[in-house]
UniProtKB/Swiss-Prot annotation:
The keyword Glycoprotein does not apply. InterPro entries: Bact_polysacc_biosynth/exp (IPR050445), BexC_CtrB_KpsE_VexD (IPR005705). Keywords: Capsule biogenesis/degradation, Cell inner membrane, Cell membrane, Membrane, Polysaccharide transport, Sugar transport, Transmembrane, Transmembrane helix, Transport. It is found in: Cell inner membrane. The keyword Zinc-finger does not apply. One of its GO terms (molecular function) is protein tyrosine kinase activity. NCBIfam families: BexC_CtrB_KpsE (TIGR01010). This is Capsule polysaccharide export inner-membrane protein CtrB. The gene is ctrB. It is a multi-pass membrane protein. May form an ATP-driven capsule polysaccharide export apparatus, in association with the CtrC and CtrD proteins. GO terms for biological process: polysaccharide transport.
Length: 387
């Protein structure tokens, strides 16, 4: 019995050696899980934990306003006010579009090395052209648009400008420069509207002056050709002359009747008769000149004279109205129609809210799990379909 014990012990030892060892949980993970979950999460952890650069956002708010008190303009002035200037609510979109435009970027380049701010700072994945593959100006413009954002509140009319960069001071500097450029744009819009308004008003005045000149020339020609300078005064003169001639005719007729009654053979009678005929002829001619049917009569000339005279007066009144509107337009245009009012100045952030490191790491892990689950389900479905 004692000789069989070593054999039994040896057999038991061999059996224990043949038992498989338990694998660690890491080794139990499938390669797919490593590829879709673990490796991306580790990369995200390393990048956001040690390499990702802080990004600072400077914020400011502004509003584009127009003066509340608008001077009242009549006639042409109201038309000029309507056509010369847009509402401030419309121009805010112009300012917003400009701040994200190539023109604004070009203006920033003249004031500061804005490309160096984004190309020479930050980690290789965050900065512009980190791998040296796309250094074109158009590529930088698209990068710039991602770093400048504007939100407009249509209820309050306030716009919020946000600028993000890798340095707090640089973000503040860019934000401040954009606000100043927006104010320059508003001034340019005001000046352009001012020039358009005054130019249009001046054109109206010039047109009215031409009408006055033309009407004045027509009136002068009529007066010279017809010998009439003041129809009413000239008519009064002629009527007065007729009245005097009629009075003289009455006197001559009275004398003639008296002489015939006293001395029918008086030698003065032929002279008085001749004088009577002359007066009657003169009165007849004067009456024809006033109301006769000839073209030269005052009655026929009165209608044409009145038309030419009224055209001249109307042209002068239109010129006076145009001059008044021009002065009103100049006074209105000299006032600043629109202005950019900064509500809050660009701040210098002392805390970087981007990148959100924990959120990005967790998001990478969750997305990896989702991808892993989808791939596993697809693989199982394919295997089941084959079987």
């Amino acid at each position: 019995m004692s000789e069989q014990l070593p054999v039994a012990v040896a057999t038991e030892t061999k059996a224990e050696r043949k038992k498989p060892k338990k694998k660690s949980w890491i080794k139990k993970l499938s390669p797919l899980f490593w590829v879709t979950v673990i490796i991306p999460t580790v990369i995200s952890l390393v990048y956001f934990g040690f390499f990702a650069s802080d990004r600072f956002t400077s914020q400011s708010s502004f509003v584009v306003r127009s003066p509340k008190s608008q001077s009242s303009l009549n006639g042409l002035g109201a038309i000029l006010q309507g056509t010369g200037f847009a509402r401030a609510q419309d121009d805010i979109y112009t300012v917003q579009e400009y701040m994200q435009s190539r023109s604004a970027l070009d203006a920033l380049r003249k004031k500061m090395p804005i490309r160096d701010f984004y190309e020479k700072e930050g980690d290789i994945f965050s900065r512009f052209n980190g791998f040296g593959l796309r250094g074109e100006d158009e590529a930088f413009y698209q990068y710039y648009r991602d770093k400048v954002s504007i939100h407009f509140d249509s209820v309050s009319g306030i716009s919020n400008l946000s600028v993000t960069s890798f340095n707090a001071g640089e973000s503040q500097k860019i934000n401040d420069a954009l606000l100043k450029q927006g104010e320059v744009l508003i001034n340019q819009l005001n000046e352009r509207a001012r020039q358009d308004t005054i130019r249009y008003a001046q054109e109206v005045v010039n047109s009215a002056e031409e009408q006055v000149k033309e009407a004045s020339v027509q009136l002068t020609k009529f007066r010279v050709s017809n010998g009439i300078f003041d129809l009413k005064a000239q008519s009064d003169v002629q009527m007065g002359l007729v009245s005097k001639l009629q009075d003289e005719l009455i006197v001559i007729q009275t004398q003639l009747d008296q002489v015939k009654a006293v001395t029918p053979e008086n030698p003065q009678i032929p002279g008085l008769i001749a004088r009577e005929k002359s007066l009657r002829k003169e009165i007849s001619q004067q009456m024809k000149a006033i109301s006769g049917g000839g073209e030269g009569s005052l009655s026929n000339q009165a209608a044409e004279y009145q038309r030419v005279y009224l055209e001249n007066e109307l042209a002068e009144k239109q010129l006076a109205a145009a001059m008044t509107s021009l002065e009103s337009a100049k006074a209105e245009a000299d006032r600043q129609q629109l202005y950019l009012e900064v509500i809050s100045q660009p701040n210098k952030p002392d805390l970087a809210y981007e990148p959100n490191r924990l959120y990005n790491i967790v998001a990478t892990f969750v997305i990896g799990l989702i991808v892993y689950g989808i791939v596993v389900l697809l693989s199982a479905s394919i295997r089941e379909h084959k079987n």
